[in-house]
Amino acid sequence: MRRGNRCLGTSTNGEDSYIRTYAADPVDTQLWKLVGSSDNFQLVNQAGQYIYVSDVPTQVTSGGENPTPLAAGNTQQEGGFSLQEAPNVTNGTGFELVANAKSGNNVANMWGGDYEGTTIGFWQTNDVNNVMYFVKPEDMTYADYKSAGISGYVPEHKLTLWYTLPATTAPLYSGGQGYSNWMEYSLPIGNGQFGGSLFGGIAKDEIQFNEKTLWSGKNTDNSAEYGDYENFGSVYAEDLSGLFNYSSTGGAANYYRQLDLTTATGKTSFSTADGSITFNREYIASNPAEAIIARYTASEAGKVSLRFTMESGKPGVVATTTYANGEGTFSGKLQTVSYNARFKVINNGGTLTTTDEGVEVRDADEVVLVLAGATDFDPYSSSYISNTAGLSTLVQSRVNDAANKSWNELYDEHVADFQKYFARVDFELDGTKNEIPTNELIDSYAKGTGADALMLEQLYFAYGRYLEIGSSRGVDLPSNLQGIWNNMSEPAWNADIHSNINVQMNYWPAEPTNLSEMHLPFLNYIWNMAENHNEWKGYASAAGQNRGWTCYTENNIFGGVGSFMHNYVIANAWYATHLWQHYRYTLDKSYLAKVFPAMLSASQFWMDRLILADDGTYETPNEYSPEHGPSENAVAHAQQLVYELFSNTLDAIEVLGNDANVSEADLADLQEKFNKLDKGLATEVYDGEWGTSQISSGTSILREWKYSTFKSGQNGHRHMSHLMCMYPYAQVTPGTELFQAAVNSMLLRGDGATGWSMGWKINLWARALDGDHARVILNNALTHSNGGAGVFYNLFDSHAPFQIDGNFGACAGMAEMIMQSVSDTIRILPALPSAWNSGHMTGLKAVKDFTVDVTWENGSATCITITNNQGQTIPVLYKNLKDANIYVIGNVQEPVTVDEKGVAVLSGEPGTIYVFDFDGSHKPTGIEAITPKQNTDVNIQGNRVSISGKDVQNVRVIDMQGRTVKSTSKTQFSLEQATGQALIVEVTTTNGQVSTHKIAMP
């Protein structure tokens, strides 16, 4: 069939006799001949089956039934078939198949839509799903060689996505929705700016690549030249070994492909059918090398034979590749940026030949491919480009520099660079095993809460951090709606920078999951566009303001904007709060001083724009609550954002002091408007309009609009824009009426959502201190996408289609279940799901630059370790904190005490470590483990301590904070100040033996 380029055939396993669409395969049931004349013929396949019109209806996946499907069997079609030229064929010639004896609609049609596995029914002429064409068997191309998956494989590292089918032949969801092998199965690698998508093909291995700055379009406002994030192109490695073919016996065995998140390495492995030779292909996107590198090897010497070619990402990127000296390159120019891509092949053994058709390697032991690409985009140039003349030299130098190193050197520096970020955090749920392919892991996820389900959740958290590192380093631009990965010239929503939640959500995990450096490309983009370019200042002017800056919902990388909702000018406030958030986690005062002018000018925009309402509060004029309901003054979304902006700006002024350089008039105006600002925290009473299955009538909910009721919106809408106060901010306090009203609003909205919306809801329910409800949303998010929200088999989040923000939202939400600190208190296990019975999460970051490790068993903490990186003071809250033994490693002014609410205030010098040990497993620094058999005994009478045993040389008494209370050579001594304390007594004998005893003073 012309649409979808699929072949007609019958089931090869005999499950039914219907004619369906299949991926091309050289099997007898797809090879057809026409017997008769062009106006009266029969269709018979090589298996001897005739096509006929059945009168037995069949159900259609997309709904309904096909009343007269085509089937195959021994019956010839009465009256035969004829062909007529298809009208309005846009991509090549084609025909319509007509059932001559059928009345009414008699043209064969893909029934129910264009997707693999659809049956063929009958419809009227001139439908796009009618058109078919014929190809000779010798001219047919196939997706890939056949392959048999490996058995009993377990990846080296648990945090690995793995599969036993290539992306080239894996089945797609039958409902269509624009799904592709790329979206469903390709595996992403990225160095933060330059990335690739891996398919694991055998006959023709594809690395489809992207570069974050390759955009069409210009810096214009609301024009047809807005542009798209473009597919850069693909490099192919075609198998020339002669060891495989497309027949059922000529395929590969022992196949698997994987993405190891621990090392950020892709891999494909397969063997010949008899298992005698194994081929391995490994892939990295190296930040140090600024290139993608692949290595192709075989288990026997001289068995690697490949042809390398490269194609630009047509139709958006149209360029011709030229080949010379083992390299291929193409270049060109879009409306603003110029681009250049180059690869180089390095062979170890065998021969290398370059022709006009590509680079061929024959009989090599090893082949290394180096791929680099770049544009002349420069975010700090007024024209957004620079050094166009040097672009080719830049890309060539990256290729040459990498080619001059061995694979092992490139791999080692890549892994070391990646792991210094990725290894900071470790999340483990007890009992998890990664023993089944990831697509099967997803399919089995809905079956329960066992080890497989927990493994998928653990993997999904790690994947979010992996994608953050892979998409947000290098150039000062944020990751877009798809991170940096895209295989289309016109992707959904242009794969742009969406400012009404999506780009912000991309960075929700950055600070709390200890990836502050990955936040910087977004933050520097905000500062640069606000301070150094004119577009955002122009949008502020267009909104009627003489000071400040703003942007709209849809943004390209040149400051250009789309047409959607130009009255959404509150994005500047949301952006500016990210600048402050980075300071809260890092305490980088020089950074704050740099970006503060952008915070101040955003505040000035709103200081000038706010209007005084009749109730005496300041309101934002004519805003709307994304993406529904009326536009009006004082919508809760905008009010909460301005409140956070003003609060952050005032806090920054306090930190910077005179360095803030704020005029007295501005400071007074800011403070006055902050004090009188409508906070967007009004409530209304739900009247049961949308039913009472979620909440009952008479329940208090937060108002989304100040002057319109909740009925102005849509029931179950995907945005929760009036709940900024709950997440990402902390404007409502647990235990208060406003907090409960916010929770009620969440209940009313329901659990249904798009992919990114579920990412938000996971965070909201974690902030609501309801871990089980948060996990319900996580369960929904990890359901395989069959046309709607969920995940694809490569764990890409599905809106649908693919949007990466949901990956990041879920990652942040899982961290929120274990630790929260946005309210300036470290809350331990605030929303632990009951299914996460035992596990640990280490390396999380809290505000004020504290690092937090938590281990728990049976739903309760067993050890909490908190590191005070910069000598700050912060409360820590955990319900059972009073039950812990407390150890302090470092100098503190006062002993750590816990109040009746489970709160301890932590203070100390930089580097101080606090350990809250609940099960006695912690071993203080410098203290030997306490063993049940001791060479010495300790007796206590009152405040007197007596040591019995031979040859006692020294006795040291240590409190539970790791401090030495007493050191003596005496075997009897008093502890005057130790009443009621638990202590460690360390006894050293003359022969060097050490015994330790835990004692409790009366």
What is each stretch, according to the model?
Residues 581-586, 590-591, 602-612, 666-713, ...:
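Non-catalytic carbohydrate-binding regions of carbohydrate-active enzymes
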Residues 39-41, 292, 862, 872-874, ...:
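Structural beta-strand segments of beta-rich domains
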Residues 1-143:
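Lectin-like carbohydrate-binding module/patch detector with strong preference for beta-trefoil
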Residues 620-652, 656-657, 802-803, 849:
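C-terminal, helix-dominated tail/subdomain
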Residues 500-511, 568-580, 637-648, 721-730, ...:
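Well-ordered alpha-helical segments within folded domains of soluble proteins
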Residues 890-892, 897-899, 926-1002:
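C-terminal outer-membrane/trafficking sorting elements
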Residues 87-91, 127-128, 134-156, 918-934:
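Low-complexity, Pro/Thr/Ser/Gly/Ala-rich linker/spacer regions in secreted
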Residues 141-564, 583, 600-603, 613-618, ...:
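Aromatic-residue-lined binding/catalytic grooves and analogous aromatic/hydrophobic interfacial grooves
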